[in-house]
Amino acid sequence: MSLLGRDYNSELNSLDNGPQSPSESSSSITSENVHPAGEAGLSMMQTLIHLLKCNIGTGLLGLPLAIKNAGLLVGPVSLLAIGVLTVHCMVILLNCAQHLSQRLQKTFVNYGEATMYGLETCPNTWLRAHAVWGRYTVSFLLVITQLGFCSVYFMFMADNLQQMVEKAHVTSNICQPREILTLTPILDIRFYMLIILPFLILLVFIQNLKVLSVFSTLANITTLGSMALIFEYIMEGIPYPSNLPLMANWKTFLLFFGTAIFTFEGVGMVLPLKNQMKHPQQFSFVLYLGMSIVIILYILLGTLGYMKFGSDTQASITLNLPNCWLYQSVKLMYSIGIFFTYALQFHVPAEIIIPFAISQVSESWALFVDLSVRSALVCLTCVSAILIPRLDLVISLVGSVSSSALALIIPALLEIVIFYSEDMSCVTIAKDIMISIVGLLGCIFGTYQALYELPQPISHSMANSTGVHA
């Protein structure tokens, strides 16, 4: 069972049966053929593990700098607000998908299909005629966002591997406050990326979520261990934050928004995870529990990290930790967690692109094309990480554009489109419009600031360190 329960034979056969409508024809290559409820599916615990791992990524380590960019008061409050809005929009998306699946008598509709079918019910003639572009737009944004996550993961793992290997001779057994060491790299970071590349290619060949849940459990254990060490250090002797600004400059706040919205990485996995549950009706409880844990963790780490290091807060909190073997292990454990998280985030673009690719070949070539496309996409994320020196700003850009649209703008507008004709209250309409405006403003101004900062010169070491921890 793959993430979306795809079966090559049924998928290829469905192409020969003839669609019932133009919309179904256009979406047949990405429709998920799900298992009936009650068959082998994910348990609540397995789903919770996947949900946590999807949302606890590299962005978590950059939250102290994000709080610094917003201010000691404005940062945590804004992070809480973004978290609540994101979860609310996840619930909206789930409700819209469930409503459409019941109306159309479908077992399941994905994000793109929900957008397309929703536009088909819109009173506007032009939108109805071009409803399929709603699915294309969502699919494009999902691919860009998820592959952007994967590119960050590549740089993160390579940078940490480089630091652990090349700074081994200056790493001590005594843990003292960090002295920032500027060492000339022995090997280019691209060499470390190429070392990681074949292992990630093999990892993404695993399509079974129940198998991946084992790796997710291991990833959560290593991440929990690294978080325990980080919290143990930052909570020891926190200085009184009297000199820290409660509100930062508005320009840096725009970068905070892009980073914060990017940090909530799991919006693309919400519908597939619910689809793969043995009892999908339990997903709401899993979502609220999991995202509550995530939001609390984000606020605590970001706020305490900034209070601990103040103006010296680095792009990743790991750069502020003592240069000893105990805290070097944080990089190793977190990198292991990110390694397995790569496979989860990779599933979404793979399941959008691969069905189209295999529909162009005969059944005998389906498996070969599947594995080839997976390998090519992993290589693409590697090349992206190699070519982009300021990945921190690129991720802020991706967060401002793609993540804002997927997490805030589209779900809110989709609720209006789908439920407007069903006596939708004015309060709900106003709420959805406000959410869309917040997402749109963040998208516009966050994009502007990221593009403004992108051409600015930056040292090689800073490019590496900031690039992986956005």
UniProtKB/Swiss-Prot annotation:
GO cellular component terms given for this protein: vacuolar membrane
Extracellular side: 68-71, 159-185, 232-252, 306-337, 389-392, 447-470
InterPro entries (UniProt xref): AA_transpt_TM
GO MF annotations in UniProt: amino acid:proton symporter activity; glycine transmembrane transporter activity; L-alanine transmembrane transporter activity; L-proline transmembrane transporter activity
UniProt KW keywords: Membrane, Transmembrane, Transmembrane helix
Topology in membrane: Multi-pass membrane protein
Bias (Polar residues): 10-20
Keyword Transmembrane: yes
Residue ranges of the TM segments: 47-67, 72-92, 138-158, 186-206, 211-231, 253-273, 285-305, 338-358, 368-388, 393-413, 426-446
Keyword Membrane: yes
Name this polypeptide is given: Proton-coupled amino acid transporter 3
Lineage start: Eukaryota, Metazoa, Chordata, Craniata, Vertebrata
Annotated gene: SLC36A3
